[in-house]
C-alpha cells in the first residue's frame, strides 16, 4: 500500500513536466486520417466608450469558443463550433457580472458544416460556415460570421471563383403569406506574385432574393431607399512586413449606397504590429443594410465615417493582445443613427489551442 502512495506523486510530477501542445488536439482515425481535432479560443476584453451625446461607460467582456473537426474520408470532412452568445450572427461577447447570469444560457451552435474536396481544385461547404468570399476587412462580413447555405471555391493558379446560395429565411410569414429570403453570391479573384510582392484583386456581386417585407428582423426590405443587390470590389497588396488593402461596395439603393474602407498594416518585428483603417459606410450600401457588418464601432454600424487604429502584440505562439481605438461620426445627419462624435477604446487578450 505504501508503495502505491509513492507512485502517485511521482506520476503527477512526470505529468507536470509534459508541456501542453500549442495546436489542435488530434485523435487519429482509420486509414491514417487525422480523424478528430479539438480546437478553441478565448478572449478577455475591456472597453471604454464615450461621446458627445452619451455618458462615458466601461465594461469587461469575454468570449469562449470550442470546436471539433472530423475527417470521414480523404474528400469528406465536417466541423462544428460552439460559442458564447450564439443567438447573434457573429461570435459576440458576454458582459461580466454575477448578479445576472442569463447570458450564460445563450451558449450554443456557432458553425456546423460539411466540406467536400473530391473535385479538382474545388472546395464545397454545406451548412453553417464562414463566408467564402474575398474581403480584406470586416466591412462586408465580420470575420467570425456564419452564413447558412451552400458555398464553393474553385482555384486554378492565379484565378479563383467563389459562389454561394445563402438562406436568410424560409417559410416566414411577414404579412404576405409564407415567403423565403436568400441571396446568391458570385465573385472572381485574381492573384499574382512578383518577387516578394503579392497582389490580389476581386470583383463580385451579391444578389438578394426577397420580397419587400421579407427578413424584416434585419430591416432589409427592398424598397428604393434600401440595399438590394450589391457590387463588391477588393484589392490587397502585401510586400514583406507591409500590407495595403481596400474594399469598395455599392448597392442598388437610390441614395446612401456606397461603403468603403482602406487600411494599412505594418509588422514592426515578430512581436509588434500596427494598423490604421479609414471607414465610410453609408446607410444602404451593404446587404441587408449592414446586418452582417462589423460590430465594434460605438453606436450604429452603418451611416458612419471614422477611423480605427490598432496595436498588435504577440506574447506567445497562441497568445496575443491588441489595443484598438475607434472614432466615428454620422455621415447623413438626416438619418437617425446614434454615432455622433463617439470614441471607443478596446483592450483584447486572445488565447487559442
Protein language model regions, located:
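Beta-barrel outer-membrane channel/assembly domains of diderm bacteria
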Residues: 2-124, 150-163, 191-195, 227-240, ...
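Active-site/binding-pocket entry motifs
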Residues: 44-46, 132, 282-283
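Short Gly/Pro-enriched turn/cap motifs at secondary-structure boundaries
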Residues: 57, 102-104, 141-142, 224-225, ...
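Short, solvent-exposed loop/turn segments at secondary-structure junctions
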Residues: 88-91, 133-135, 285
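Solvent-exposed loop segments that connect transmembrane elements
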Residues: 92-102, 175-179, 213-223, 286-300, ...
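Signature for the C-terminal beta-barrel architecture of outer-membrane proteins
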Residues: 118-124, 132-274, 278, 329-331, ...
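Residues on the solvent-exposed faces and adjacent turns
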Residues: 128
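C-terminal hydrophobic structural anchor segments
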Residues: 271-329
Amino acid at each position: 500500500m505504501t508503495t502505491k502512495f509513492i507512485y502517485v506523486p511521482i506520476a503527477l510530477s512526470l505529468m507536470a513536466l509534459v508541456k501542453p501542445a500549442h495546436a489542435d488536439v488530434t485523435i487519429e482515425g482509420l486509414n491514417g486520417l487525422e480523424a478528430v481535432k479539438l480546437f478553441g479560443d478565448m478572449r478577455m476584453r475591456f472597453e471604454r466608450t464615450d461621446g458627445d451625446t452619451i455618458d462615458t461607460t466601461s465594461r469587461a467582456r469575454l468570449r469562449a469558443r470550442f470546436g471539433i473537426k472530423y475527417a470521414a474520408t480523404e474528400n469528406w470532412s465536417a466541423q462544428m463550433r460552439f460559442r458564447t452568445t450564439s443567438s447573434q450572427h457573429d461570435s459576440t461577447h458576454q458582459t461580466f457580472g454575477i448578479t445576472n447570469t442569463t447570458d450564460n444560457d445563450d451558449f450554443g451552435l456557432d458553425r456546423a458544416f460539411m466540406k467536400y474536396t473530391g473535385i479538382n481544385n474545388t472546395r464545397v461547404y454545406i451548412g453553417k460556415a464562414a463566408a467564402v468570399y474575398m474581403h480584406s476587412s470586416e466591412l462586408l462580413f465580420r470575420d467570425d460570421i456564419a452564413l447558412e447555405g451552400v458555398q464553393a471555391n474553385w482555384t486554378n493558379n492565379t484565378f479563383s471563383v467563389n459562389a454561394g446560395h445563402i438562406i436568410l429565411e424560409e417559410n416566414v410569414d411577414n404579412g404576405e403569406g409564407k415567403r423565403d429570403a436568400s441571396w446568391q453570391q458570385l465573385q472572381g479573384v485574381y492573384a499574382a506574385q512578383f518577387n516578394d510582392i503579392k497582389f490580389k484583386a476581386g470583383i463580385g456581386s451579391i444578389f438578394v432574393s426577397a420580397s419587400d417585407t421579407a427578413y424584416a428582423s434585419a430591416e432589409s426590405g427592398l424598397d428604393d431607399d434600401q440595399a438590394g443587390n450589391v457590387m463588391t470590389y477588393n484589392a490587397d497588396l502585401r510586400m514583406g512586413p507591409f500590407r495595403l488593402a481596400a474594399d469598395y461596395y455599392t448597392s442598388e439603393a437610390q441614395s446612401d449606397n456606397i461603403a468603403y474602407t482602406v487600411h494599412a498594416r505594418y509588422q514592426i518585428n515578430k512581436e509588434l504590429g500596427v494598423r490604421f483603417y479609414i471607414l465610410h459606410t453609408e446607410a444602404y450600401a451593404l446587404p441587408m443594410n449592414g446586418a452582417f457588418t462589423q460590430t465594434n464601432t460605438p453606436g450604429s454600424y452603418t451611416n458612419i465615417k471614422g477611423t480605427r487604429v490598432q496595436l498588435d502584440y504577440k506574447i506567445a505562439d497562441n497568445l496575443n493582445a491588441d489595443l484598438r481605438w475607434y472614432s466615428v461620426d454620422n455621415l447623413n445627419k438626416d438619418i437617425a443613427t446614434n454615432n455622433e462624435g463617439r470614441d471607443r477604446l478596446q483592450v483584447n487578450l486572445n488565447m487559442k489551442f
